[in-house]
Amino acid sequence: MSLSPSRIRLLDSVTVNQISAGEVIENAASVVKELIENSLDAGADEIHIETLGGGRGQIVVRDNGVGMDPEEVPVALQRHATSKIAHFADIFSLASYGFRGEALPSIASISKMEIHTARAGGLGSKTLIEKGEPVCCEPAPRQQGTTIAVHSLFYNVPMRQSFQKSPQMDRLAIRRLLENSVLSSEGIGWTWISERRQELHVAKKQGFIERVALVLGESFVQEAFFIDKQQGDLRVLGFLGSPNQHRSTRQGQRLFINNRAVESSFISKKVAEAYAWMIPAQRYPIFVLKLFLPPMWCDFNVHPQKTEVRLLQEGQISNLLVEAISEALLRRSSSLEEIVLKVPTEKIPIENEGISVPSIRPAIVSAPLSCPTFSQQPYLKTEMATIVSRDSASSSLSVVEKVRFLTSLGKVLLVEDSEGVHVVFVQAARKHLFYVSLLSERLESRLACQTFLLPPSVQMTKLEADFLQMRLEALTALGIELSRISPDSFAIESAPPFIQEEELKEWIVALAQEGALHVGESFEQLVENTVQKLVFSRNARAFDYAWLDILWKLGKPEKAFDGEMIRRLVLDDDFM
């Protein structure tokens, strides 16, 4: 029977904790976060995590921290029981992760929990907790430290269960959380066992650079700019991704303030402003930045999960960031200028034109790159693209007009056929061709694929690589053959034509990233979304326009699959 709205009652402790859990515990990753932060605050330097069912079946966190005496366990299960602060003012000088004393009772109120703990020289105890209350406590010897096992998460709050995402999404959230923990906490060893398989292992002796390479890949570290700048009590340390390394979302950005993973639109904006002239619009740089600020400048008590931060003295922080980033980018710019000045000019042949154009090409990559026309590339065995009619109504494609390249005007080309002169928008045209070659079953045409004699490799996070591994057959059906050469990288055996190697690699990483993030989305929709965001016009090879013939074989469409303009006939009215 419902209570009268006019009567005011005190809520029981279980209900209070369950309400609090709704704020603090969003999903299984939230539980892992709170438990490992307890381990870190307890001084642990070895933390072992095990999860089943994406964490909803079981979460076990084992550490070698200071541990607890048996009589401390029931106290730790009460709300606002903490060893971190005594007064509100202490929040602004915190060096610990937790301070509210809400996490453990909140988790215990929506799960079945077991705590096995011992202090140095202590006997050790094991406590069973159900619905937030200890039901059994017995002596249980163990070495110094604590093991907390959480079973059947949300078992007694079915409404919360119905709002949970898939176990795969939970695993993704846990992986990102643990990757951030690996980056933020040097001197700590980490092991994560997911579904009885080791997903992550980092020795405590591994340094910051090794950890960045583990999380973001060795290729990121090799191309990134290292920064380390200090002004008084302020310091910024980390890696800024090369301008060639950018993504369609901010997922590649890792920010830590005083070793706490946080989000800050202010800092993200400052970094983006520094890259504005180097990367395409609506793309985001990759970075790993660690800021060390006076604790009284940071308010982490903004969000229950402490993922947001309010900052004081933004002007000083901005000055430090701008100077550090500018110095790093200027160092790279200077080194590139020196390389360019040392490279002699050479002539690039233009197929079927009989003329040559001087070009300066800096040798800034490990393997020599050349700029011949597409059909002359020595590292590709390219089959001439063929158009296969799937319907008698499309038989008109067999009559193909000749198209002649006239000139390039930056992002557009002028070409000529029997109808007249056309303006072709390079980005939209090449994007459309790539899309046709991927999803031709939807468009009645199919373009042949190119096979790499020396397969390039592409690197990503292990979770993203696992997503691609599950989609290898679907990718092969699209003409992309990948072979896994390490836990976090693939070799590209073959791919659709008319896309440069770096663009192809960028698209594969984007597909893996989007697929890992949006588990419920169809593969075809993921392909379409990521192709739409891909930038084709950047660093296009000079006079490599063999793809124009294919565009004309497709009937010289005026608009791309997403409605973007591909070409327009130049009319007399344009000159009046």
UniProtKB/Swiss-Prot annotation:
Q: Which InterPro entries match?
A: DNA_mismatch_repair_CS, DNA_mismatch_repair_MutL, DNA_mismatch_S5_2-like, HATPase_C_sf, MutL/Mlh/PMS, MutL/Mlh/Pms-like, MutL_C, MutL_C_regsub
Q: Name one GO molecular function term.
A: ATP-dependent DNA damage sensor activity
Per UniProt, the keywords (alphabetical) are: DNA damage, DNA repair
Q: Please give the biological process terms from Gene Ontology that the record holds.
A: mismatch repair
The GO cellular component terms are: mismatch repair complex
Q: Does the keyword Ribonucleoprotein apply?
A: no
Query: Where does the signal peptide begin and end?
Result: none
Q: Which Pfam families does the record match to this protein?
A: DNA_mis_repair, HATPase_c_3, MutL_C
Top-level lineage group: Bacteria
Q: Which family does it belong to?
A: Belongs to the DNA mismatch repair MutL/HexB family.
User: What's this protein's function?
Assistant: This protein is involved in the repair of mismatches in DNA. It is required for dam-dependent methyl-directed DNA mismatch repair. May act as a 'molecular matchmaker', a protein that promotes the formation of a stable complex between two or more DNA-binding proteins in an ATP-dependent manner without itself being part of a final effector complex.
What HAMAP family does the annotation carry? Answer: DNA_mis_repair
**Protein name, please?**
DNA mismatch repair protein MutL
* Organism listed in the record: Chlamydia trachomatis serovar L2 (strain ATCC VR-902B / DSM 19102 / 434/Bu)
Upper lineage is: Bacteria, Pseudomonadati, Chlamydiota, Chlamydiia, Chlamydiales
